[in-house]
Amino acid sequence: MPPMTRKTRIQPIEPVAEEDDNGYDRPSKSQLKREMHELQVLGQALVDLPKDALKRMPMPESLGDAVREARRITDHEGKRRQLQYVGRVMRSLTDDETAALRTALDAQRGVNKAATARLHWIERTREQLLASDDALTEFLRQHPDADIQEGRTLIRNARKEAQQGKPPRYFRELFQWIKAAGGASDSDDEAADDAGDDHDDDEA
């Protein structure tokens, strides 16, 4: 009977970090690929920003030109190539410049989130006011400075025009009345403009 041989488990080889001529570890290919993807995503986020929000981004001139050109192009393939170019320009930024852009984008997303929530509140309130007279009593209790007579008139007219199939003039005016009663400021309106791309332009 031949002697039993002991199986040796082969340990996986750990990847060794590459070193440059000065002895410092260089990023792995996977790390570089991941960083390039993150910058590409950041560039896409800039291209997708509303026009007014884009003006507030701390971008070097070269990046600003590349982003604006990407926004201008409508051809799918041309836009894809331009977005790749935006990514290459992004890779030329310093760490501080990239960090400043991320901070500004995070702040803009916060503004958009708050503005969107506010628009949804106005829309829900309008639906409630049109559905029930009790909703107006509750609204006036929470917003005592609102013009009661104007609110009642707008609600009555909005209901009537809906029944008659007329254009929603008073429906839109009721939106503005609720927004004003809720204490909308100039900054609220600016935020709503940035967040309202998917809302009725007449209501923003």
Swiss-Prot record:
It is found in: Cytoplasm. CDD domains: YjgA-like. One of its GO terms (molecular function) is rRNA binding. Pfam families: DarP. GO terms for biological process: assembly of large subunit precursor of preribosome. PANTHER family: UPF0307 PROTEIN YJGA (PTHR38101:SF1). Belongs to the DarP family. Member of a network of 50S ribosomal subunit biogenesis factors which assembles along the 30S-50S interface, preventing incorrect 23S rRNA structures from forming. Promotes peptidyl transferase center (PTC) maturation. This is Dual-action ribosomal maturation protein DarP. It comes from Burkholderia orbicola (strain MC0-3).
